Amino acid sequence: MNARMNSNIDDRREKTMKYAATGWILWRPDPSLVKQESYEIDRLLEAAPEHAYQVEVVNPDDVQLLVNSEKEDGIFVNGDKVKLPDFVIPRMGSTTNYFSLAVLRQLENLGVYCLNGSAAVELARDKLLHLQLLANAGLPVPKTILVQFPVNADFVETEMGFPVVVKTLVGTQGSGVYLCENRENLVDMLQFVEANNPSAQLILQQFLSESRGRDVRVVSIGGHIVAAMERIAKSGFKSNYSQGGEARPFEYGHRNELSVAEVMRILDMDIAGLDFLYDEEVGFRICEVNSSPGFEGLEATCGVDVPAFIYEYLDVKFRISRKAKARLLGQIPG
């Protein structure tokens, strides 16, 4: 990936340019993904210098933590003590584990601004937990059941009916999502899972026929909608852009914009991708929230510049004025 290999910063410009702040993108490749999110990483690296930020990619697996009571940073990369960044953008996605969360917490404890914080990343990673919080706040979500083996098929049929969606608790880009059309399909599938992986963590989710093969993806930064698109499956019921689905811009109403802001507030997120399903009763139900959303499809479909929104949001957080930014970029005399 050229942008990552070259750090995406022109050497000559780096020598003369001053930066508003420095940042890390916490990222590791995920072999289980249909498509690696190299696009998003490259875009964040490419756009950083244009906004007077210096950003590099750090794999959390390369980080060593030193927890002590001394006033020392306690962060090492590949065994070397490093200067702390001013901010961190976590992009671990489904590869998030205890260690990467510990790295994020350590950075937070040392005063590094994290976009999002460890609590928000952990919440988003658990599909059931964030739906529980949203449901408790009165926001519309699909009916959801946590799987216990053996599965009570009578209960599922009574409370949800069929078809029913089966999901792993952790997964992105449509991976780990299956549709069981009837009771027999569900029983056969879950018996197979129980026999091969009895500790598997699964949820069952209400299937909304109005949303078969389509949903709405919204990307929000700071509680405001950057853009929204309707995703449409080419075949089957999964509408993910990364799996070859089509997309078109979607106009989001004021009422729905308020619900997005409420989701962001409840989950304490700075940036998120929110997936909404169509429902004839309430209009939309919140299906899932992602703390490190892909935005290749959104940029291509809606013509927005997502990294620009992210860095402008950081401008506000770090109280960097437009005049100060222009000086840093050499647009006006220093």
Model-predicted regions and their roles:
Residues 70-71, 212-213, 280-285:
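A short, glycine/Asx- and small/polar-enriched loop/turn
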Residues 164, 226-227, 272, 285-287:
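Protein kinase-like catalytic core scaffold
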Residues 1-115:
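ATP-binding N-terminal substructure of ATP-dependent carboxylate-amine bond-forming enzymes
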Residues 192, 237-286, 308-334:
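A long amphipathic alpha-helix within ATP-dependent nucleotide-binding catalytic cores
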Residues 94, 290-302:
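Glycine-rich phosphate/pyrophosphate-binding beta-alpha loops
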Residues 178-267:
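Phosphate-binding site of ATP-dependent enzymes
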Residues 171, 223, 279-282:
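Short strand-connecting beta-turns/loops that link adjacent beta-strands
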Residues 16-45, 82-83, 105-111, 115, ...:
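Active-site nucleotide/adenylate-binding loops and adjacent lid/helix of ATP-dependent enzymes
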